């Protein structure tokens, strides 16, 4: 019994490694090869750059004017990336590539929990091979980060409502995650 558990654990770890490496191979290469092209990409990267220039990380701004339309989390992630990689296209898009990898891992773990490892792997690979998510995870727009936290918040809320987690911790976590997105 112990050997079977050990083999299953190794197989699960192997699946996770394959998913993470696949995400790295699919989402990270050539992030900075193309100029920022979309209004959102350009302005979001500029907002992060302006945070660095002014040192004001509490207020999102464009052209040094307040920009209240978007929540700050994504811009903070871009700032961290720009501080690590410099102010460039790669740094503006890197947070979404990491979010893409984390999304794949999350899908695998949720699929494994509710069905089995095979389902989790198929779900993660289906997401990996889908055109629109692939495009989003290689962009510098807010949607992947926003969608990830909204998805997790709804998932936590659904578990709480179903009664799997009767205490309020899942409800609080759902609110916190949705709050991060918005």
Where in the sequence are the language-model features?
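Membrane-integral, polyisoprenol-dependent glycosyltransferases
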Residues: 2-182
């Amino acid at each position: 019994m112990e050997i079977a558990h050990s083999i299953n654990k190794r197989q699960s770890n192997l699946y996770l490694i394959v998913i993470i490496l696949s995400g790295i191979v699919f989402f990270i290469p050539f992030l900075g090869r193309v100029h920022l092209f979309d209004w959102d990409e350009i302005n979001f990267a500029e907002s992060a750059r302006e945070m660095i220039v002014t040192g004001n990380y509490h207020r999102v701004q464009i052209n040094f004017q307040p920009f209240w339309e978007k929540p700050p989390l994504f811009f903070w992630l871009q700032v961290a990336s720009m501080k690590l990689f410099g102010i460039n296209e790669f740094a503006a898009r890197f947070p979404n590539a990491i979010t893409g990898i984390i999304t794949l891992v999350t899908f695998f773990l949720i699929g494994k929990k509710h069905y089995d490892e095979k389902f989790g792997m198929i779900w993660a690979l289906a997401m990996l091979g889908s055109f629109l998510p692939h495009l989003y995870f290689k962009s510098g727009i807010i949607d992947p980060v926003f969608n990830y936290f909204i998805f997790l918040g709804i998932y936590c809320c659904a578990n709480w409502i179903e009664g799997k987690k009767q205490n309020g911790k899942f409800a609080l976590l759902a609110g916190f995650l949705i709050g991060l997105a918005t």
